[in-house]
Amino acid sequence: MWFKNLLIYRLTQDLPFDAEALETALATKLARPCASQELTTYGFVAPFGKGEDAPLVHVSQDFMLVAARKEERILPGSVVRDAVKEKVEEIEAEQMRKVYKKERDQIKDEIIQAFLPRAFIRRSSTFAAIAPKQGLILVNSASPKRAEDLLSTLREVLGTLPVRPLTVKIAPTAIMTDWVKTQKAADDFFVLDECELRDTHEDGGIVRCKRQDLTGEEIQLHLSTGKVVTQLSLAWQDKLSFMLDDKMVVKRLKFEDLLQDQAEQDGGDEALGQQDASFTLMMLTFGDFLPALFEALGGEEIPQGI
């Protein structure tokens, strides 16, 4: 399993993460299908494997992997609006009276309840890696909302989960702008060919560059007029490439073939072995990559009082 995005959270207290206890806790809130009148459900699933015997916590070396699944019924807003409009017009025509907001809202609720059993089902899963020794939780998502859904549900079943988004001492925008402007990144990091530039003024312009030489005059001209880099494609060593944004979100992670080939060799012929090998190698790589990234961004910022 190779993460494609990364939201990084710092555990602010030492928690005794025990795989068996965590397994028991997650089992109290399993993922389940939506009932006929439910809009959404959320719960934990096995990250690898299927069936009742598949563990909810995958453990490899000092790392743990968990997964949560959201199931939701999709009701297009336009369908609901059209049905409400039709019903309101019918009432007003037949009863010769005006339908006001309170009654309109009631009609909308009734229509939603009537439509729910026939609505399409959408399922989505979110994975999180727990690294207790490093004090980190890494969520495979670029959406803070999806990450918070998982973390808050994990907090619910554990009773406590003191975490916060990891922050650095120097704003990523300042560092990325400097790297492009000076045409030199931190050690072991390499600027690639994609970036987003934004004007710092309110309602300022946005320039998105793709497959472009970021050392060229055009980019330097944008920087000289006050634009800053808010997204930048980078590579680290010869192991991975990614897009970093101004919110410290790592997107579009891609692990190089050398790592993937090694995981394939380590994992053997079974699917579970392949998944375990790739997860383990990914986490060991993160063990070197993330401290280097934090250092390149001025080091981790520890808020006062923590």
Curated annotation (Swiss-Prot):
Pfam families this protein is in? RdgC (PF04381)
UniProt cross-references to InterPro entries, sorted A to Z: RdgC
Q: What is its main location?
A: cytoplasm
Keywords on record: Cytoplasm, DNA recombination
GO BP, one annotated term:
DNA recombination
Output the Gene Ontology cellular-component terms. bacterial nucleoid; cytoplasm
Name the Gene Ontology molecular function terms of this record. double-stranded DNA binding
* Compartments it resides in: Cytoplasm, Nucleoid
What protein family is recorded? Belongs to the RdgC family.
Free-text function comment from the UniProt entry: May be involved in recombination.
Q: What is this protein called?
A: Recombination-associated protein RdgC
